[in-house]
UniProtKB/Swiss-Prot annotation:
This is NAD kinase. It comes from Clostridium botulinum (strain Kyoto / Type A2). NAD(+) binds at residues 61-62, 134-135, 145, 164, 175-180, 234. One of its GO terms (biological process) is NADP biosynthetic process. GO terms for cellular component: cytoplasm. It is an enzyme of class 2 (transferase).
Amino acid sequence: MKNIGININTDKDISRNILDKIFQYIHEECSEAKIKVFYDSKGLDNEESRALDAVMVLGGDGTILGTARALAKYDVPIFGINRGHLGFLAEIELEDCKEAIKNLFKGQYKIEDRIMLKCDLKGIDKKDDFLALNDIVLTKGNLSRIVKYSIYVDDVWYTTFVADGVIVATPTGSTAYSLSAGGPIVYPDLDVLEIAPICPHSLGIRPILLNGNSKINIRVLKKYEDPVLTIDGQRYKKVTVNEVTISKSKYKCRLIKFKDKDYFKILRTKISYRSRECEGE
């Protein structure tokens, strides 16, 4: 492992001193390492990124999401040094950075392949893949009015309802927006997709889990303005068509996980309780 990328979120508190320390830690493990620094993911999706052996992300979970979309087609593994709020995906804290880099070069890690989503808009040029690691969300526009949606799974009608919107989430995204919409937490290596309605006008409309190979077709039956498509809470597009199709992408996000990191411990401390870890209690 000699070609290392570092993607920095410039909105976070990342001083030159921090970056110099990271350079030092890398060169202590591999004096011949070549380091390429990216700022706010600019240039990260270029073909040259294919040569990178790994990318370190300095930011929060949102920076991880952007990095994952940029690198998905290049099969480059990533890991995050948390400089954000939650740090669920960017799980390495700054004080543990040196140890993480040491383990990286010693090969003391595993790679988790996470499902990603793709979205096709009926009648729209497919040059934009609309990849997502967490979720793809279809919602009403700015007006405070609900929208009528009809959902088909593998070309079979599932249900029709009125709501503020619809979330289609991956297992990775199950701890994000869909969790707030009442969806379940899904273990990250399961091959499933989740549909979670947002504020449905019916007590009988609940989130559902589907086989990961399912094709989900969402049709907008009644609208007062063009609905909005949101990718990972970061990309935004007004939808002028009445139909979108969401399915599993052929690309995956490759997350580097170090052996001392326990998913359930992270879940307890950062999602379930957000409090002091009490081992065994």
